[in-house]
Design a protein with these regions (language model features):
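A substrate-binding/cap region within the structured catalytic cores of diverse enzymes
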Residues: 1-7, 18, 22
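Second-shell residues forming the walls of enzyme active-site clefts
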Residues: 13-26, 30-167
């Protein structure tokens, strides 16, 4: 449940407070990351442990969960490990080309650096390396691995393409 980690369940309140916070931080030269894009407001479970399936209509998603991300501009955003069946019934947003391209990049007009949430979370159904590669293939610019397991990090270094230029 994201409610305890959010400003509100009301998308207008989230949009207004989010915009104020981002403006304040950026004015003070602090970078911000908006998360979890395209939105987890309608989720009823914690994606650290289980994959949220958000069965809302496209219209409801655009009016509620997706709305704050159109208002709150940042250079960085973190994807949601949730399934939105009305857009892509098979993949979490992190692994979905459809959601990243059509919803995040086009509808929300997000032009910044797109970062996956932690690829070792239980809400992703593949192994660590596969989760990382699928996130990059779907359109994430960076993948996060946050559990501190050095053995896993060593494996990832071998399969993740190196960044040799920024475009």
């Amino acid at each position: 449940d994201i409610a305890s980690r959010s400003f509100s369940e009301n998308s207008k309140v989230v949009s207004n407070l989010g915009r104020l916070c981002i403006d304040f931080y950026e004015k003070n030269k602090i970078a911000t990351v908006i998360k979890h894009i395209p939105g987890l407001g309608l989720s009823r479970c914690d994606s650290h442990y289980k994959t949220p399936i958000i069965n809302a209509s496209k219209d409801e998603l655009f009016k509620k969960d997706f709305k704050p991300f159109k208002v709150c501009r940042s250079l960085f955003a973190m994807t949601a490990h949730a399934v939105y069946p009305k857009f892509d019934p098979y993949n979490t947003a992190t692994h979905s080309k459809i959601i990243i391209k059509k919803v995040i990049r086009c509808h929300m007009n997000f032009k910044g650096l797109l970062i996956s949430d932690d690829i070792s979370m239980k809400s992703l159904k593949y192994g660590l390396e596969e989760n990382a590669l699928r996130a990059l293939h779907a359109g994430c610019n960076l993948v996060l691995h946050c559990n501190g397991n050095m053995r896993e990090m060593s494996k990832l270094i071998k399969v993740i393409p190196k960044i040799d230029k920024f475009t």
